């Protein structure tokens, strides 16, 4: 049996459960439970994705969330020397996220959810502050929006049509 290149890449992805919620509906025979899960997938080298899923069983919700996360992978190419190239402030619904580059040896200074996202993205040195909403989904969306808005020095020079020696 041979593995394709695509499935080999999929095997390198690590999956983490960010949030699990249990909802209950009261029916004639008692309570009926359903679950939702927010799942994060990454390889620590710039590939990252998140997925949200609902199901009647917890394991099904986690499995479906992982599948959704693998379908929505993004690639962050502007990670220079383990940090981000510039500061970024992002608004997503009610959540605000501030990411600042840090010197080598600083580590990841951030809240637990944002720290997990940045670790799985492969960022080594960064300072992050989450402002506003504490809703996990909004914080995850804000983090992804911030990471996608990063541009390297080379990209900025190309946009400005400036040559650099």
Swiss-Prot record:
Part of the 30S ribosomal subunit. Contacts proteins S4 and S8. Residues 13-76 form the S5 DRBM domain. With S4 and S12 plays an important role in translational accuracy. PANTHER family: MITOCHONDRIAL RIBOSOMAL PROTEIN S5. GO terms for cellular component: small ribosomal subunit. Transmembrane segments: none annotated. GO terms for biological process: translation. It holds the Pfam family Ribosomal_S5_C. This is Small ribosomal subunit protein uS5. HAMAP family: Ribosomal_uS5_B. The gene is rpsE. Belongs to the universal ribosomal protein uS5 family. It comes from Chlamydia caviae (strain ATCC VR-813 / DSM 19441 / 03DC25 / GPIC).
């Amino acid at each position: 049996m041979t593995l394709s290149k695509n499935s080999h890449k999929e095997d390198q992805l690590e999956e983490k459960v960010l949030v699990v919620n249990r909802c209950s509906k009261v029916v004639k025979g008692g309570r009926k439970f359903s679950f939702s899960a927010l799942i994060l997938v990454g390889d620590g080298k710039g590939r990252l994705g998140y997925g949200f899923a609902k199901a009647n069983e917890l394991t099904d919700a986690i499995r479906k969330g992982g599948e959704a996360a693998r379908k929505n992978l993004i690639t962050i190419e502007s990670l220079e020397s383990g940090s981000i190239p510039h500061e970024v402030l992002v608004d997503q619904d009610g959540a605000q996220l501030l990411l600042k580059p840090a010197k080598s040896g600083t580590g990841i200074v951030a809240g637990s959810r944002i720290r997990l996202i940045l670790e799985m993205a492969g960022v080594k040195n960064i300072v992050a502050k989450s402002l506003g909403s504490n809703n996990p989904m909004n914080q995850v969306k804000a983090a992804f929006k911030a990471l996608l808005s990063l541009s390297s020095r080379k990209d900025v020079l190309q946009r400005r049509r400036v040559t650099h020696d």
